[in-house]
Curated annotation (Swiss-Prot):
Tagged with keyword Transmembrane: yes
Lineage of producing organism: Eukaryota, Viridiplantae, Streptophyta, Embryophyta, Tracheophyta
Residue ranges, Cytoplasmic side: 24-51, 116-137
Protein name: Protein MODIFYING WALL LIGNIN-2
InterPro entries listed in its UniProt record: DEAL/Modifying_wall_lignin1/2, DESIGUAL
Any one Pfam family match given in the protein's UniProt record, by short name: DUF1218
Extracellular side: 73-94, 159-217
Length: 217
């Protein structure tokens, strides 16, 4: 139940990040917003994309953190036993986790750059080397799509670890049941052998006693 709540938090934060990225795409500074002075110095006013992009980055980072908490919980709470039971096949979850973190770094770098360009660029200062820069078409939208992709990979990784743990736990329970049955059968067999040996001993003693009595007669 606790993991379900964390999954819903990741989904909600990811959805907010996705929506704010697309909102920033429509609110970004356009070419016609650029102004020039008599010395051909450029000026770009700030746009709402700055605030929207900042909110998108914040939500995405929080979603990534919560998602990794779920992964850590699922991995840390795996069943450990005296016979050395542990989850060994984590290839797919590990690949998805690495993909998620690589995607996270790319998205944060792209959004951080786009957010920085969305601030006001004063005359004679610009954004870099006194030149003004604008965010290209589709940058915010693509970042939102990548954010959803990365969070999806992270969620699948956490779910896969959980499912793998449950599957191996079932296998261990079945193995224990088989071992108990085998042990019970061995004990019954030993008991039967003991009874058989005991019966044979009694028969042998009776035969000896009978033989002795006959000899005396």
């Amino acid at each position: 139940m606790h993991n379900l709540f964390l999954y819903s938090v990741v989904f909600s934060l990811g959805l907010v990040s996705f929506i704010t990225c697309f909102a920033a795409e429509f609110k970004r500074t356009q070419k016609e917003d650029i102004r020039w002075d008599t010395e051909r110095n450029c000026y770009v006013p700030g746009s709402h994309a700055f605030g929207l992009g900042s909110a998108a980055v914040l939500c995405f980072c929080l979603a990534q953190i919560v998602g990794n908490i779920v992964v850590f919980r699922n991995h840390r709470t795996r069943t450990k036993r005296e016979d050395g039971y542990k989850i060994t096949d984590l290839t797919l979850p590990t690949v998805l986790l690495l993909l998620s973190w690589s995607n996270f770094v790319v998205v944060v770098l792209i959004l951080s750059t786009a957010i920085s360009m969305s601030r006001a660029q004063a005359y004679g200062e610009g954004w870099l080397d006194e030149d003004c820069y604008l965010v290209k078409d589709g940058v915010f939208a693509a970042s939102g799509c990548l954010a959803i992709l990365g969070l999806g990979a992270l969620t699948i990784s956490a779910t896969r670890i959980k499912v793998k743990k449950q599957q191996q736990l079932v296998q261990v329970v079945i193995k224990d049941q088989n071992q108990d049955q085998r042990r019970s059968m061995e004990e019954e067999q030993k008991h039967d052998e003991h009874q058989t040996n005991k019966s044979e001993s009694v028969i042998h003693l009776v035969e000896e006693v009978s033989s002795t009595n006959i000899s005396r007669i």
